[in-house]
Amino acid sequence: MRVAALVLTCAIALAPRAAFAENFKPFTLKTLEGDERSLPQVLGGKATLVAFFFPTCQYCNAAFPLVQKIYDANKDRGLAMVWINVIPDEQRLIADWRTSHGYTATILLGSRSVAEDYDLRMTPTHVLLDGKGKVLWKHAGYKPGDEKEIDRRIQQALSKE
């Protein structure tokens, strides 16, 4: 499984590059519970932080506790959050992973093609959208301190909503 994750990460990094469009590409993906969600349903007219991840990603596991705190502090102000898994082989790990960490984000089940569709270079990749699906900001990877920029961008987006 880790080999598959490494291969996918390398394949994503080496794939031809196509920039994020001004508007986020529409999608319909399944939740862990098996329900389908489209981009408009996910947005619900709110600023939304989308994160592409997989459960054994060490950088995701470093970032997400901090991102969860940012979400908790801003959800009552209108922030939505959704995480999209990009490694199908790890889908069976997600429910226990989410529960053990206390994460509350809506989690959608993506695929390698989803990673390619959105030109992902690494995980986590965070994309901040306005309520209409316009890309306000994108950030790939995580290093300590990045959460401050994520929070700053969210505050900017919420002040415009």
Question: Language-model features: where?
Answer:
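A short beta-strand-turn-helix
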Residues: 27-48
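Structural microenvironment flanking redox-active thiols in thiol-disulfide oxidoreductases
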Residues: 61-101, 113-117
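Thiol-/selenol-based redox modules, centered on thioredoxin-like
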Residues: 128-161
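Hydrophobic beta-strand anchors of alpha/beta hydrolase catalytic cores
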Residues: 49-50, 81, 126
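Short pre-active-site segment immediately N-terminal to redox-active cysteine/selenocysteine motifs
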Residues: 46-48, 53-56, 122
